[in-house]
């Protein structure tokens, strides 16, 4: 059973939002306070978002669907790949190709081409062609693999998408909404939570925060067949929480 504590969220810097001037007004309901011109997120609402997303993910998996992990920013890329592989789910961590969802049949053809090129590498084809041809094939294979490796085994549209930084991944959200695919996302203070089916208020820039959220989603998938839920331990009251919150240089503003 996954156990989440208020202290673990604080240690990961989950509560740190962006500078006050970067607030999306639609995020106001998730704001706890303000410190040194930095917004502090309400961790009670973060915990609720975690609980809701955990249950939603397990429901998707039990219905025989997959969860697509998406995070293309530098802080998220490696974590997204690692946790998606751990839970044997598809992922996109380099660049979202327009139409990955809305034009899925065309994308599948590109995936089939990638698989064909990979097969040529091991079935003896390379021994029968020139070095120049091998070089050309390898270049094409690497180009396709860069963006498609994570979805090679995604035979149909996912039941849900988990996104790190929905503000960055607007194309993903637009495609998913048009197709009615459930969207779960970590929403920072500069995001629009209204386009997300299951928003999780949190820091989407700090690596520890991104890792914590992504691991929770992966754990939910892995435990979906065990009828195991998530345990929330709220071991800090509001007074303790306020004393713990000290904004130093936890966030690099761009």
UniProtKB/Swiss-Prot annotation:
Where does the record place a coiled coil?
none
Record's GO cellular component terms: cytosolic small ribosomal subunit
**Keywords from the UniProt entry:** Ribonucleoprotein, Ribosomal protein
Q: Which PROSITE patterns match?
A: RIBOSOMAL_S2_1
Q: Which GO terms describe its molecular function?
A: structural constituent of ribosome
Tell me if Ribosomal protein is a UniProt keyword of this record: yes
GO BP: translation
Pfam families with a match to the protein in the record: Ribosomal_S2 (PF00318)
Chain ranges passing through the membrane: none
Similarity comment: family membership? Belongs to the universal ribosomal protein uS2 family.
Q: Which HAMAP family match?
A: Ribosomal_uS2_B (MF_00291_B)
- Protein name per Swiss-Prot or TrEMBL: Small ribosomal subunit protein uS2
């Amino acid at each position: 059973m996954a156990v989440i504590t208020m202290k673990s969220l604080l240690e990961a810097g989950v509560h740190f939002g962006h500078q006050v001037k970067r607030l999306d007004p639609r995020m106001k309901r998730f704001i706890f306070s303000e410190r040194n011109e930095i917004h502090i997120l309400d961790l009670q609402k973060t915990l609720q978002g975690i609980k809701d997303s955990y249950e939603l993910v397990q429901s998707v998996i039990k219905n025989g669907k997959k969860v697509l992990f998406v995070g293309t920013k530098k802080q998220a890329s490696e974590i997204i790949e690692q946790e998606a592989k751990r839970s044997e789910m598809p992922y996109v961590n380099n660049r979202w190709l327009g139409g990955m969802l809305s034009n899925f049949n065309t994308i599948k053809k590109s995936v089939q081409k990638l698989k064909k090129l990979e097969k040529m590498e091991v079935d003896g084809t390379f021994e029968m062609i020139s070095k120049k041809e091998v070089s050309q094939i390898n270049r094409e294979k690497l180009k396709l693999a860069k963006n498609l490796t994570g979805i090679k085994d995604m035979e149909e549209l996912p039941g849900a998408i988990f996104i790190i930084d929905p503000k960055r991944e607007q194309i993903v959200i637009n495609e998913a909404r048009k197709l009615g695919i459930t969207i779960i996302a970590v929403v920072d203070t500069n995001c629009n939570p209204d386009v997300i089916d299951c928003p999780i208020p949190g820091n989407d820039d700090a690596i520890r925060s991104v890792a914590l959220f992504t691991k929770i989603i992966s754990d939910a998938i892995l435990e979906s067949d065990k009828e195991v839920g998530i345990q929330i331990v709220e071991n800090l009251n509001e007074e303790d929480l306020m004393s713990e919150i000290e904004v130093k240089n936890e966030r690099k503003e761009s």
